[in-house]
Amino acid sequence: SSNAELTVEEIVKIRQALFSKNYSTAKRVQSFSSKEDFEKAKKLMIEMSENYKVLIDLFPENTEDEFDTEALPTVWEEKGAFNALMTKASEDMIKLTSVIEDAEDIRGTLKQFMWSNCKACHTRYREEH
């Protein structure tokens, strides 16, 4: 992959920064959506979708034991399932762009297509905070 020239530490920092950015972006998606500013919300949804695709390649084998990672060993033990969840999260953000404007329940729709994936990943693949 294109990350071959990065150090383990750099890879961990990059993936943590991306997850962190997605979280702050998700909060902005929620805010814009609740104000019915759907154009801004959709731009951010697409940004998040792209980030999830990038994240799939940021968990190479050699980064599993990095002291600073919050990722659990289950990421590598269940790599197929983890990658599938990242892909689902990415695809759900794209689906969200097409359903959010007509959603009866904006919060519920965001929960279904966005927050539920965050929760699924944190529950299974991230250390408790």
What are these regions (language model features)?
Residues 2-3:
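Cleavable N-terminal signal peptides
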